[in-house]
Amino acid sequence: MHLSTHPTSYPTRYQEIAAKLEQELRQHYRCGDYLPAEQQLAARFEVNRHTLRRAIDQLVEKGWVQRRQGVGVLVLMRPFDYPLNAQARFSQNLLDQGSHPTSEKLLSVLRPASGHVADALGITEGENVIHLRTLRRVNGVALCLIDHYFADLTLWPTLQRFDSGSLHDFLREQTGIALRRSQTRISARRAQAKECQRLEIPNMSPLLCVRTLNHRDGESSPAEYSVSLTRADMIEFTMEH
């Protein structure tokens, strides 16, 4: 029997480095982290920068990392786990995983409710609702855009003061109102141009569209309806049965 000794039958040095780095990415890195500088990695593996770059190219092609001009190599893998239950809290959940979540307000207005917002909140189309839009980041990386809708206009003076951090924590601290998730619907679609700009992602990237109803304890009508556009590569939802 003839056994091929062609060089391509064996992993090249850059393929070996890529495999080693991929293993380390799985075990030690989180989405939003950066790899050590190119010079450090080349010295560690005792190769020239050209070989090291070919190894990084393989990780880029597989979607593990992304090159950021002038910044470094950004880790994209290992999506965060997010449990979908009545008590789920975005900020606390990510803090428990050793990450640094932040949230900033992009918009706060009173506007007439569209048909789907009115249906979700159980009100008449055209009635005014409070509309807040927030951008959430994890370790500095944009994760999701969220549109929040509230039917109770007495909350408007309070919600106007919200600027950053956890919206639900702010609402509880300012008003004593605690919200509980009562329904979640998840679908998928491609990101549109403005969404790509806000989320700092390539055109047509996959997004998870998460529609959520939140209730106050003891009340039948929803207090909040939210629509979250979340990067599909950065999060995994877990549902216990």
Swiss-Prot record:
Q: Which GO terms describe its molecular function?
A: DNA binding; DNA-binding transcription factor activity
Q: Which residues form the HTH gntR-type domain?
A: 11-78
Q: What's an example GO BP annotation here? A: organic phosphonate transport
Q: Which UniProt keywords apply?
A: Alkylphosphonate uptake, DNA-binding, Transcription, Transcription regulation
Q: Which InterPro entries match?
A: Bact_HTH_transcr_reg (IPR050679), Chorismate_lyase_/UTRA_dom_sf (IPR028978), CP_lyase_PhnF (IPR012702), Tscrpt_reg_HTH_GntR (IPR000524), UTRA (IPR011663), WH-like_DNA-bd_sf (IPR036388), WH_DNA-bd_sf (IPR036390)
Report the DNA-binding ranges: 38-57
Instruction: Please tell me whether the keyword Transcription is annotated for this protein.
Output: yes
Q: Which CDD domains does UniProt cross-reference here? A: WHTH_GntR
Asked if the keyword DNA-binding belongs to this entry, the reply reads yes
Q: Which NCBIfam families match?
A: C_P_lyase_phnF (TIGR02325), PRK10079.1 (NF007486)
Something else known: The sequence shown is that of strains K12 and B.
Task: Describe its function.
Answer: Belongs to an operon involved in alkylphosphonate uptake and C-P lyase. Exact function not known. By similarity could be a transcriptional regulator.
What is the protein name given in its UniProt record? Answer: Probable transcriptional regulator PhnF
